[in-house]
Curated annotation (Swiss-Prot):
Binds 1 heme group covalently. One of its GO terms (biological process) is photosynthesis. The keyword Ion transport does not apply. Its cofactor is heme. Residues 1-35 form the signal peptide. Keywords: Chloroplast, Electron transport, Heme, Iron, Membrane, Metal-binding, Photosynthesis, Plastid, Signal, Thylakoid, Transmembrane, Transmembrane helix, Transport. Component of the cytochrome b6-f complex, which mediates electron transfer between photosystem II (PSII) and photosystem I (PSI), cyclic electron flow around PSI, and state transitions. GO terms for molecular function: electron transfer activity; heme binding; iron ion binding. The 4 large subunits of the cytochrome b6-f complex are cytochrome b6, subunit IV (17 kDa polypeptide, petD), cytochrome f and the Rieske protein, while the 4 small subunits are PetG, PetL, PetM and PetN. The complex functions as a dimer. It comes from Lepidium virginicum. Coiled coil: none annotated. Belongs to the cytochrome f family. The chain crosses the membrane at residues 286-306. This is Cytochrome f.
Length: 320
């Protein structure tokens, strides 16, 4: 009987621990993942629109810089680095989903030419692995190995993200050719302002949905506000809900206009996109170029030697 009670107690403790862990995970994930690459994966078949705009800009409304560094040329079946830089002021804090202030996270999407893909672990050098750190990249879609996403990850540690890329080999992939190819990148720091369903996050400005007099501002128990606006012309009441974490710019009794900001803008992040070009070089072409350059150098040497020989002959004839 005692043994049965012991097993029952252990089972209850395990169940409680799992439940608590799941709750912590859900709360943590909800607070950091707003409008990161996973939203693009869920809602867009291709992250780059026909206009060239990367869809992350639909949720991250502020425009911020991003940069990418890749080699000018690569040889087939070789691994190279694509370094994405997402600069921002490390002292900045953002509003989290729970209304508190926290550090910024970053995310990126890298759109490679067809045939280029994430390098397998056994092809990555120790030096490159050290630059990559603990990052875990994933394909945008199982059938789109040339589109890679990462994030959210801590911005203070990964404001520069190194992607290990494997160049294709036209000898084994007939759809790939020795050409110059474009590479596109999008990078964000901080949370987005709009969710994919069109609703606002608490990381943006909230405007008045009606004009009139603010008759009441109610501070909610779990954070945030309810602002009651009364239209003086018809006494109609409108209640605007302000989520937690935002700073009000208005007060009771104040007269406001339609679309007037009720809060300050908390957003300190933003999204940017860029591009680069890379040449998939034919090794035979490189060998041919080296042979040509070698021939030119040899020709120059022979000309110099011939000139010196001619000068010696002229000098000997003059002495004779």
């Amino acid at each position: 009987m005692q043994t049965r009670n012991t097993f029952s107690w252990i089972r209850e403790e395990i169940t409680r621990s799992i439940s608590v862990s799941l709750m912590i995970y859900i709360i943590t994930w909800a607070s950091i993942s707003s409008a990161y690459p996973i939203f693009a994966q869920q809602n867009y078949e291709n992250p780059r629109e026909a206009t060239g705009r990367i869809v992350c800009a639909n949720c991250h409304l502020a425009n911020k810089p991003v940069d990418i560094e890749v080699p000018q040329t690569v040889l087939p079946d070789t691994v190279f680095e694509a370094v994405v830089k997402i600069p921002y002021d490390m002292q900045l804090k953002q509003v989290l989903a729970n209304g508190k202030k926290g550090a910024l996270n970053v995310g990126a999407v890298l759109i490679l030419p067809e045939g280029f893909e994430l390098a397998p672990p056994d092809r990555i050098s120790p030096e490159m692995k050290e630059k990559i750190g603990n990052l875990s990249f994933q394909n945008y879609r199982p059938n789109k190995k040339n589109i890679l996403v990462i994030g959210p990850v801590p911005g203070q540690k990964y404001s520069e993200i190194t992607f290990p890329i494997l160049a294709p080999d036209p000898a084994t992939n007939k759809d790939v050719h020795f050409l110059k190819y474009p590479i596109y990148v999008g990078g964000n720091r901080g949370r987005g302002q709009i969710y994919p369903d069109g609703s606002k996050s608490n990381n943006t400005v909230y405007n008045a949905t009606a004009g009139g007099i603010i008759s009441k501002i109610l501070r909610k128990e779990k954070g945030g506000y309810e602002i009651t606006i009364v239209d003086a012309s018809n006494e109609r009441q409108v209640i605007d809900i302000i989520p937690r974490g935002l700073e009000l710019l208005v007060s009771e009794g104040e007269s406001i206009k339609l679309d007037q900001p009720l809060t300050s803008n908390p957003n300190v992040g933003g999204f940017g996109q860029g591009d680069a070009e890379i040449v998939l070089q034919d090794p035979l072409r490189v060998q041919g170029l080296l042979f040509f350059l070698g021939s030119v150098v040899l020709a120059q040497i022979f000309l110099v030697l011939k000139k010196k020989q001619f000068e010696k002959v002229q000098l000997s004839e003059m002495n004779f």
